[in-house]
Amino acid sequence: MQAEIIAVGTEILMGQITNTNGAYMAKQLTALGIDSYHQQVVGDNGPRLEEAIKLAESRSNLVILIGGLGPTPDDLTKQTLAAHLNRKLVEDPDAMAKLQARVKQQQRPMTPNNQLQAMYPEGADILVNRVGLAVGAWIVNGQHTYVLLPGPPKEFVPMVDHELLPRLAKWSGHAEIMVSRVLRFFGIGESQLVTDLDDLIANQTDPTIATYIKDHEVTVRVTASGATEKDADAKLEPMIGAIMDRDGQYFYGYGDDNSLAKELVKTLAANDMQITAAESLTAGAFQAALGDVPGVSTYFKGGFVTYSLATKAAFLAIDARELAAHGVVSAFTAKAMAEHARRKAAADISVSFTGVAGPDTLEGQPAGTVWIGLARRGQLPEAHVYHFPGGRNDVRQRAVMTGMMLALRALQA
């Protein structure tokens, strides 16, 4: 049995985005003992995609196509494969109902290109999209089996884990159940984490370990097999324990769809506490990230964006002379912002951000210098200084995530 992966997308072909999906899929095939000797990348072009499919058929009996299932005119994968197999596209009622609900919620009309997301080649088995709208498919056609998977990683990974891997295990004669656990880490680079886990990775058999980096955090996927889910879980626990023994101080939560913001809101809920923030260089990004989490309004009533010294003094009632004396980029300002914001919002915990996003220096401090303040009810405020690498947006994003990690650890203490 041989599998071939075809990544579809002009952005991948042009080097604008990295083909992380192909690497992830290849690791899963290896874990199942399925040989894969070739991968292809094809742009959003129907004729060239069909050529790639024909080439894959000539040397593999499992063809996995990733990407091109969305609603835009250049999303041609399912149409191209359906035409190649001489099958029409039919509608999945469940996917269409989900799509209609989304369209209604957004108060916009249903368009034919949107409807395509709920279509699949006739005779295929549906692979449910737990995150997005475009359905995947498992298609058996003679001696070949074809798989359609969405391109966005947040949709692709859950579909592979929950929908595809059980089918692949059966298809390959791998009778055991595969179970994966995703561990999320922040504050450590992938290279350092891999170094820390070097012997575990080098000696892995079952469970297997795979690491990924995205948006300044690292995820570790640990996968084990067993006759039952309980058996697989029993294999996972010692490996997860070994990982946590080495890098547990950077761990913040489990799950594909988790985030620091979600984990922070969950912990606020568990403690029945409210949070606020006072932001300078991050310009409200911390509060915006909190606002993306459903149900946050119970634990976050509002906050402050105080970019200039004058607004810090006016909105937060901080003595302007003290601010001028210590400077914007200082421990004093970070502490004062956090504590005054907490008092004004009557919150239990508060985070503040002040510093130099760049590219220019400020008060003699280089770009990337960030002070983050933390204030808790009944405790003295504290401030932490960081020197983040990267451009302006990277500095701001790292600051927001670091502030979330600080607040999370304070709530867990």
Swiss-Prot record:
It holds the Pfam family CinA_KH. InterPro entries: CinA, CinA-like_C, CinA_C, CinA_KH, Competence-induced_CinA, MoaB/Mog-like_dom_sf, MoaB/Mog_dom. SUPFAM superfamilies: CinA-like, Molybdenum cofactor biosynthesis proteins. Signal peptide: none annotated. Belongs to the CinA family. It comes from the Bacteria. This is Putative competence-damage inducible protein. Gene3D superfamilies: 3.30.70.2860, CinA-like (3.90.950.20), MoaB/Mog-like domain (3.40.980.10).
